[in-house]
């Protein structure tokens, strides 16, 4: 039986035993992620174990899609898939071998960095983070790929300060609707706190703007240090979006009343748009506020795209984007969301200072209340 099962796996993949697992650094519905080291070369890697428990008909289709996409995407700001490894099926693993995706190791994820109050980003460093993030989105969108799970935990940063978009487990190729027939993609994607309003309203014919909404949430998070809209349900998330971005109406979002759930959900009425007003206590730079405002536009057709965002004055005004390597060199321990305390509302987090000085005596240490 073991031999039969083994034959449907990856006969040309190396054994994962060539790597020594060092620590678990991630856990999710997708499986587990480990920091590991190549036994011969010493190269550090990340091993993502593909969850096979519920697969009765061989290799999971979602993992096949992720592998295909990662083999297509080769860019400095996209995580690099090195190879695919396996463990052989045997009586010791109930005749079920495991598959591992092997990636270049990145020392941190953005959620882990933001959860650590000792990590201080200057304004110029925030500019560099967002510049690399948008560069990555520009590249994948040019290659007709949607990420569909933009959040701080899926943004990796190496010790040299290079940002990598990661976790393409929900990613897919996209295309323009053909012959007036809309696409029918699933809208059950994107972590709730980063999910754009069009998906919450049931839209299935969507594109790159869904990832740009997540980029806007992440950009605001660079100052608030915690997700800015932490809904408990889809209805609650829409209410939080309305409180920040204004009520969802056909006046601000043409044809939104044609969306499947527009009439079925109780949408908040009478709310004015106040993205800048609500965030200006945290985000002091006017260009930064303006870009966040353009990323968090309700109507996906009017939301700024990655190309225009990269040309925004935020990136072309003083202080200019600067390298992260110097700041990260003072933090020798890896920081990941999985290893950090939860970044939920109610937690007391020090407001992000964008002063160029990192002297604790001169850095603003005032505690802030949540945006919501």
Swiss-Prot record:
Autophosphorylation at Thr-186, Ser-347, Thr-350, Ser-353, Thr-354 and Ser-357 triggers kinase activity by promoting cyclin and substrate binding (e.g. HIV TAT) upon conformational changes. Thr-186 phosphorylation requires the calcium Ca(2+) signaling pathway, including CaMK1D and calmodulin. This inhibition is relieved by Thr-29 dephosphorylation. However, phosphorylation at Thr-29 is inhibitory within the HIV transcription initiation complex. Phosphorylation at Ser-175 inhibits kinase activity. Can be phosphorylated on either Thr-362 or Thr-363 but not on both simultaneously. Dephosphorylation of Thr-186 by PPM1A and PPM1B blocks CDK9 activity and may lead to CDK9 proteasomal degradation. However, PPP1CA-mediated Thr-186 dephosphorylation is required to release P-TEFb from its inactive P-TEFb/7SK snRNP complex. Dephosphorylated at Ser-347 by the PNUTS-PP1 complex during RNA polymerase II transcription pause-release. Dephosphorylation of C-terminus Thr and Ser residues by protein phosphatase-1 (PP1) triggers CDK9 activity, contributing to the activation of HIV-1 transcription. It is found in: Nucleus; Cytoplasm; Nucleus, PML body. Induction: By replication stress, in chromatin. Probably degraded by the proteasome upon Thr-186 dephosphorylation. Disulfide bonds: none annotated. Transmembrane segments: none annotated. The active site is at 149 (proton acceptor). The modification Phosphothreonine is found at residues 186, 350, 354, 362-363. InterPro entries: CDK, Kinase-like_dom_sf, Prot_kinase_dom, Protein_kinase_ATP_BS, Ser/Thr_kinase_AS. The modification N6-acetyllysine is found at residues 44, 48. It catalyses: L-seryl-[protein] + ATP = O-phospho-L-seryl-[protein] + ADP + H(+); L-threonyl-[protein] + ATP = O-phospho-L-threonyl-[protein] + ADP + H(+); [DNA-directed RNA polymerase] + ATP = phospho-[DNA-directed RNA polymerase] + ADP + H(+). One of its GO terms (molecular function) is chromatin binding. GO terms for biological process: cell population proliferation; cellular response to cytokine stimulus; DNA repair; negative regulation of protein localization to chromatin; nucleus localization; positive regulation by host of viral transcription; positive regulation of protein localization to chromatin; positive regulation of transcription by RNA polymerase II. Ubiquitous. Changing residue 186 to D: Mimics autophosphorylation; constitutive kinase activity, independently of calcium signaling. Residues 343-372 are annotated as: Disordered. Its EC number is 2.7.11.22, 2.7.11.23. CDK9 inhibition contributes to the anticancer activity of most CDK inhibitors under clinical investigation. As a retroviruses target during the hijack of host transcription (e.g. HIV), CDK9 inhibitors might become specific antiretroviral agents. May be a target for cardiac hypertrophy future treatments. May also be a target in anti-inflammatory therapy in innate immunity and systemic inflammation. It is linked to Chronic activation of CDK9 causes cardiac myocyte enlargement leading to cardiac hypertrophy and confers predisposition to heart failure. Protein kinase involved in the regulation of transcription. Member of the cyclin-dependent kinase pair (CDK9/cyclin-T) complex, also called positive transcription elongation factor b (P-TEFb), which facilitates the transition from abortive to productive elongation by phosphorylating the CTD (C-terminal domain) of the large subunit of RNA polymerase II (RNAP II) POLR2A, SUPT5H and RDBP. This complex is inactive when in the 7SK snRNP complex form. Phosphorylates EP300, MYOD1, RPB1/POLR2A and AR and the negative elongation factors DSIF and NELFE. This is Cyclin-dependent kinase 9.
């Amino acid at each position: 039986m073991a031999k039969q099962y083994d034959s449907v796996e990856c006969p040309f993949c190396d054994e994962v035993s060539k790597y020594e697992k060092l620590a678990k650094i991630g856990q999710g519905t997708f499986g587990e992620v480990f920091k590991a080291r190549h036994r011969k070369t010493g190269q550090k890697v990340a091993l993502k174990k593909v969850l096979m428990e519920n697969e009765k008909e061989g290799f999971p289709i979602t993992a096949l899609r992720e592998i295909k996409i990662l083999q297509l995407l080769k860019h400095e700001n996209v995580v690099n898939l090195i190879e695919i490894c396996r463990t052989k099926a045997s009586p010791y693993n109930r005749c079920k071998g495991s598959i591992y995706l092997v990636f270049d190791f990145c020392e941190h994820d953005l959620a882990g960095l933001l959860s650590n109050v000792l990590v201080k980003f200057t304004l110029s460093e925030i500019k560099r983070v967002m510049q690399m993030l948008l560069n990555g989105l520009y590249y994948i969108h040019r290659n007709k790929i949607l990420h569909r799970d933009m959040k701080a935990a899926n943004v990796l940063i190496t010790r040299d300060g290079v940002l990598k978009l990661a976790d393409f487990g929900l990613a897919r190729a996209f295309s323009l609707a053909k012959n007036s027939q809309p696409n029918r993609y699933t809208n059950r994607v994107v972590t709730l706190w980063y999910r754009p309003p069009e998906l919450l309203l049931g839209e299935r014919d969507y594109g790159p703007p869904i990832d740009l909404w997540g980029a806007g949430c992440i950009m605001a998070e660079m100052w608030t240090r915690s997700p800015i809209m932490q809904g408990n349900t889809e209805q609650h998330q829409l209410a939080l979006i309305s409180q920040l971005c204004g009520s969802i109406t056909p006046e601000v979002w043409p044809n939104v009343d044609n969306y499947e759930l527009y009439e079925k959900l109780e949408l908040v009425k009478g709310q004015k748009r106040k993205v800048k007003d609500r965030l200006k206590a945290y985000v002091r730079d006017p260009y930064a506020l303006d870009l966040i405002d353009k990323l968090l536009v309700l109507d996906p057709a009017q939301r700024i795209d990655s190309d225009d965002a990269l040309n925004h004055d935020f990136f072309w005004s003083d202080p200019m984007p600067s390298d992260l390597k110097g700041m990260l060199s003072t933090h020798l321990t890896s920081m990941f969301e999985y290893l950090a305390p939860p970044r939920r509302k109610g937690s007391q987090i020090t407001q992000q200072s964008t002063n160029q000085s990192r002297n604790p005596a001169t850095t603003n240490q005032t505690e802030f209340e949540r945006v919501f």
